[in-house]
């Protein structure tokens, strides 16, 4: 998997010179201190899920849960970004939690849902952007879902009501995720005015206008 991602990034770097006069928007995102971890479990699958009680839960408010993206994106820019082949991301069921908590993809992409727990899960969503119900499946099994419509998809487990995750489906590939330190770098963009958006499942959405010059990069630090 790591080699596949590395190869995809190298391919993107090689493709970027075709974007004449491309610049980069980068910076640091600051968020408030992460909240307390959730605990407990509801609707455990009889005879199995109770053994998972007390497992660590996902913290809320982490900077790595954020998604940073821009618009508008020219068709030729999107064509370059979309040309880089990347493996389908995985939203795993692990330790009675969805891992990772947040996934961002472009419309037309797929997501795999592997079960890594020794119990059954039933992953579903009722979101208008993508409704699905994967049914119960055991450890070692996986299901794949295609996402063709932009929008926010809230993902849950019918068996374990405290499990929740988010799939943000964007109309293009001009997005990024901040590192644990909050640092972020967007893909190369042609000169022009862009709307820079930050979305976080716990903190909401912010946006600001950013101008990419004909030469040089732009540093835009963000905070909630």
Mark where each language-model region is.
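Bacterial N-terminal signal peptides
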Residues: 7-17
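Short helix-onset patch at the extreme N-terminus, typifying the N->h transition
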Residues: 6-9, 28-30
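Extracytoplasmic copper-binding redox domains, predominantly the cupredoxin/blue-copper superfamily
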Residues: 19-224
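Positively charged n-region of N-terminal signal peptides that target proteins for export
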Residues: 1-5
């Amino acid at each position: 998997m790591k080699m596949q991602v590395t190869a995809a990034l190298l391919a993107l770097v090689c493709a970027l010179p075709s974007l004449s006069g491309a610049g980069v928007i980068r910076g640091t995102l600051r968020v408030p201190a992460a909240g307390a971890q959730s605990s407990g479990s509801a609707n455990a699958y009889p005879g199995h899920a109770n053994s998972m009680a007390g497992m660590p839960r996902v913290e809320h408010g982490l900077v790595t849960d954020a998604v940073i993206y821009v618009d508008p994106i020219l068709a030729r820019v999107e064509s370059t970004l979309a040309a880089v082949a990347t493996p389908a991301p995985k939203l795993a069921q692990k330790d009675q939690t969805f891992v990772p908590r947040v996934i961002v993809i472009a419309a037309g992409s797929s997501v795999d849902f592997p079960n890594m727990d020794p119990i059954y899960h039933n992953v579903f969503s009722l979101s208008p952007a993508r409704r699905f119900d994967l049914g119960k499946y055991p450890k070692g099994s996986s299901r794949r879902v295609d996402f063709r419509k932009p929008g926010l998809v809230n993902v849950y487990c019918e068996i374990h009501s405290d499990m929740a995750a988010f799939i943000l489906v964007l109309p293009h590939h001009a997005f990024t995720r901040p590192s644990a330190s909050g640092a972020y770098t967007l893909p190369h963009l042609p000169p022009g005015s862009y709307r820079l958006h930050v979305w976080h499942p716990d903190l909401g959405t912010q946006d600001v206008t950013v101008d990419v010059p004909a030469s040089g990069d732009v540093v835009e630090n963000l905070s909630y």
